[in-house]
């Protein structure tokens, strides 16, 4: 990602653990490969710095996780690596690579693109490269060049045995530099875990089906605790984040998970947070989560207008949101509301209604992101079919200070006004006396540095 494009919002970013790449690294190590991991953002490297590290390692295969805003940087890295390491092959994974696999290999940004779960696919690719094979048609879940023409092999069968995967190879990453919420981390080190893959919901703005898959799969709760304990003991983790879009989704898994955490004393050693839907937070669920050490939930609320929630197939109501937030607060869990402004059909008046809804909920934290139709989402597909999409990928960011670079705005909603509304939303929510007291007296989670960045981001 080009941080310069984020303008005044750049300082609000903090490196987060890349669990997908860590899973791939672990699978390759288990397969007998010598693996090196580089986190460009966490290590504060420019492109030349990354390529220098790659060249010193002399790799046979270079892999990158590619999100849409980082695609131009990854393309540049690929070009530079081909010059410095001409014998190395390049493989891309992630949402962007999944959606644009044929274009990526045709343009030579990468030699291969991996689709969805990549652990087995990459190991088979390594074996084929080592054996000097040119025909890769037998590797499911791979796009490659066959006689100069992009060829996408059949999809790989969904991996139902998530507990059979090795733990992510965090020892290869600068884990001590990671955060989860730059404005509100409890303690460090922090790492992430996955209790499931896939999602049964089909929100129009989400591209998850291109990484986690359409099929929802979950892990054994006891096995999850085993990994939790390993991360606490091995890396001294103080705050754990579940990267599942909804955790826990299956209520019957929560009680054994919590009981096992308590029996091992992990509820006292490490706090955890998860993202979920507000309508999954009944009283019993919240009380169990708190007992097990959960101290914060992130809820994808999106909007305070029921019409807009329906427009993006969220399948929830504002009444259910109120109920879930109240249950979490009653249990002692801090609440983070994730909102989107500029949804299809939205007007400035509706944006104000959403912000006032966030204020009325009395959330501990709130994030107001400008809607972006990310590749892989239905919002993007709709624009693709109407030939309205744009390929200036570096501008696919939810905090964009330049209205001329906004990827999307609802018809009739002036882009400049939408950008101003985002800054106003942050000021309206955070600059209230009650909220200021909460941050600095009750929660004490915002550092002076992040306060200054936040005020600058609000354009105060």
Put a short name on every predicted segment:
Residues 20, 24-161, 370-376:
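Glycine-rich beta-alpha loop elements in corrinoid/cobalamin-binding modules
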Residues 1-13:
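Short glycine-rich His-centered loop
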Residues 55, 105-106, 232-233, 290, ...:
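Non-catalytic positions within long, well-ordered alpha-helices that form the structural scaffold/packing
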Residues 30, 51, 60, 378-460:
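Radical SAM enzyme core and accessory elements
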Residues 41, 67, 96, 243-250, ...:
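Short, solvent-exposed turn/loop segments enriched in Gly/Ser/Thr/Pro and often Arg
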Residues 101-106, 285, 345-360:
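Catalytic cores of alpha/beta
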Residues 16, 163, 168-338, 348, ...:
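Radical SAM [4Fe-4S] cluster-binding motif and immediate context
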């Amino acid at each position: 990602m080009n941080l310069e494009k984020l303008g005044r919002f750049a300082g609000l970013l903090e490196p987060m653990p890349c669990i997908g790449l860590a899973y791939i690294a672990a699978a390759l190590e288990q397969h007998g490969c010598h693996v090196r991991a580089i986190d460009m953002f966490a290590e504060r490297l420019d492109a030349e710095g990354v390529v220098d590290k790659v060249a010193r390692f002399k790799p046979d295969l270079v892999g990158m996780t590619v999100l849409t805003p980082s695609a131009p940087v990854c393309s540049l890295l690929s070009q530079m690596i081909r010059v410095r390491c001409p014998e190395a092959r390049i493989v891309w994974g992630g949402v962007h690579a999944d959606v644009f696999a044929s274009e990526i290999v045709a343009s030579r940004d990468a030699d291969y693109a991996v689709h969805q779960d990549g652990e087995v696919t990459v190991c088979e690719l390594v074996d084929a490269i080592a054996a000097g094979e040119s025909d890769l048609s037998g590797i499911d879940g791979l796009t490659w060049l066959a006689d100069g023409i992009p060829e996408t092999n059949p999809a790989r069968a969904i991996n139902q045995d998530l507990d059979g995967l090795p733990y992510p190879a965090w020892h290869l990453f600068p884990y001590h530099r990671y955060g989860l919420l730059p404005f509100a981390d409890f303690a460090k080190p922090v790492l992430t875990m996955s209790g499931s893959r896939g999602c049964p919901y089909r929100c129009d703005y989400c591209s998850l089906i291109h990484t986690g898959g359409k099929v929802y799969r979950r892990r054994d709760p006891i096995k999850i605790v085993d990994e939790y304990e390993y991360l606490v003991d091995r890396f001294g983790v103080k705050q754990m984040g579940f990267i599942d879009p909804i955790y826990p989704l299956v209520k019957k898994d929560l009680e054994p998970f919590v009981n096992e955490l308590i029996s091992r004393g992990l509820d006292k050693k490490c706090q955890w947070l998860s993202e979920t839907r507000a309508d999954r937070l009944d009283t019993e669920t919240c009380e169990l989560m708190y007992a097990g050490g959960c101290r914060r939930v992130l809820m994808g609320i999106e909007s305070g207008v029921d019409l807009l929630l329906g427009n993006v197939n969220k399948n929830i109501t504002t009444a259910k949101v109120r109920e879930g937030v109240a249950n979490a607060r009653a249990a002692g869990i801090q609440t983070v509301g994730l909102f989107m402004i500029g949804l299809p059909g939205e007007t400035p008046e509706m944006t104000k209604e959403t912000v006032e809804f966030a204020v009325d909920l009395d959330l501990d934290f709130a994030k107001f992101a400008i809607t972006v139709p990310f590749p892989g989402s239905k919002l993007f597909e709709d624009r693709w079919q109407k030939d309205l999409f744009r390929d200036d990928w570096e501008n696919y960011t939810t905090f964009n200070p330049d209205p001329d670079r906004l990827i999307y705005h609802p018809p009739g909603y002036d882009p400049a006004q939408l950008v101003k509304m985002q800054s106003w939303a942050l000021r309206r929510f955070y600059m209230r006396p009650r909220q200021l007291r909460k941050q600095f007296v009750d929660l004490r989670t915002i550092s002076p540095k992040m306060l200054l960045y936040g005020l600058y981001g609000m354009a105060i």
